A protein has these predicted regions:
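NAD(P)+-binding Rossmann beta1-loop-alpha1 motif at the extreme N-terminus of oxidoreductases
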Residues: 1-63, 67
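Residues at the starts of beta-strands that form the adenosine-phosphate
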Residues: 7, 30-32, 117, 144, ...
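Short beta->alpha hinge that forms the Motif I/post-I loop of the SAM-binding pocket
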Residues: 36, 72-73, 97
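Rossmann-like NAD(P)-binding element
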Residues: 58-88, 92-93
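Rossmann-like NAD(P)(H) cofactor-binding subdomain of soluble oxidoreductases
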Residues: 80-133
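Internal alpha-helical scaffold of NAD(P)-dependent oxidoreductase catalytic cores
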Residues: 137-222
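Interdomain hinge/lid region at the active-site interface
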Residues: 207-277
Length: 287
């Protein structure tokens, strides 16, 4: 159970950072915020997401925080930590929301002052829209919360991350290594976004919206995308993503070959396999 006397700081009040701030405040924790945009900071203040916040001269907020949530892109988090990481006080445990861990966790842990611990985690939730104004619309309950400990993490920090996830409302919490996380995310998240984006880029017919049905809308929902964030995540995990794209391309080529050969049996076989795997997936979805 989380200690409600501890002070929380959210650095980066975007969609997920804003949601963390909102849920922690609703649960009775003291939450401060740091954000580059004055407008988004004011929104968080006016709507009660945070108790106080700053866009600059925020060293006092950093040094007084018991726990910090970084809602920053990986590159920005590393740059921020190089500048301000020395301000974190001993005993501070902090986490992130980044969708990629390789290249992030090791350098940040190496920069941690004595007694400070980076417990990396990934809330697999979001929306097509970004910014703190949409944070309240995010639903953590059906989403996965992935904790990625290393040998530098203590049992106390791992338990803190689990307790944090429960307070935030996640119903499914799991633990993976950094490498396992990035390989898995390359398939279940990044490949899906790559397919949706490619589908939208494959046809420039401006009249498509007049004829599409639910299948097209469902498949391309995530194609409305934060270009800067996803470009960074794709490039940071490019080896895993390229591997998954190659496997997907091989499966698509099998279907193409079946069409060229008028191979009805092969098509039906692929459809049955897809149906079976989707049914098994549905049974395992968190409620």
């Amino acid at each position: 159970m989380l200690d409600k006397t501890k002070r929380y700081l959210v650095v980066g009040l975007g969609l997920l950072g804003g949601k963390y701030a909102l849920e922690l405040t609703k649960a009775g924790f003291h939450v401060d915020g740091i954000n580059r945009s004055e407008g988004h900071l004011q929104y968080a203040l006016e709507h009660g997401y945070i108790a106080s916040g700053k866009t600059h001269d925020f060293e006092d907020l950093v040094s007084s925080a018991d726990h910090i949530i970084f809602g920053l892109y990986p590159t920005a988090l590393i740059e921020w930590f190089r500048t301000y990481g020395h301000l974190l006080k001993p005993g501070c445990i902090f986490t992130d929301v980044s969708g990629v861990k390789t290249g992030l966790v090791e350098p940040v842990q190496a920069m941690c002052p004595a007694g400070v611990e980076f417990m990396a985690s990934h809330p697999m939730a979001g929306r097509e829209t970004s910014s703190v104004e949409h944070a309240a619309e995010v639903n953590f309950a059906p989403a996965n919360f992935i904790i990625t400990p290393t040998e530098k993490n203590t049992p106390e920090a791992i338990q803190w991350a689990k307790d944090l996830a429960e307070v935030l409302g996640f119903h499914h919490i799991c633990t993976l290594t950094v490498q396992e996380h990035d390989k898995m995310i390359g398939y279940v998240s990044q490949l899906c976004h790559a397919i949706a984006v490619s589908l939208m880029c494959a046809n420039d017919n401006s009249s498509l919206c007049e004829y599409t049905g639910d299948s097209f809308r469902d498949l391309t929902r995530i194609a409305r995308i934060n270009d800067k964030m996803w470009a960074e995540l794709f490039l940071w995990n490019k080896e895993n993503l390229i591997s998954e794209i190659d496997q997907f391309d091989a499966a698509l080529q099998q279907m193409r070959a079946a069409l060229v050969a008028d191979d009805r049996n092969k098509l039906e076989q692929m459809f049955r396999l897809s149906t079976q795997r989707r049914a098994a997936f549905d049974k395992k979805l968190p409620e």
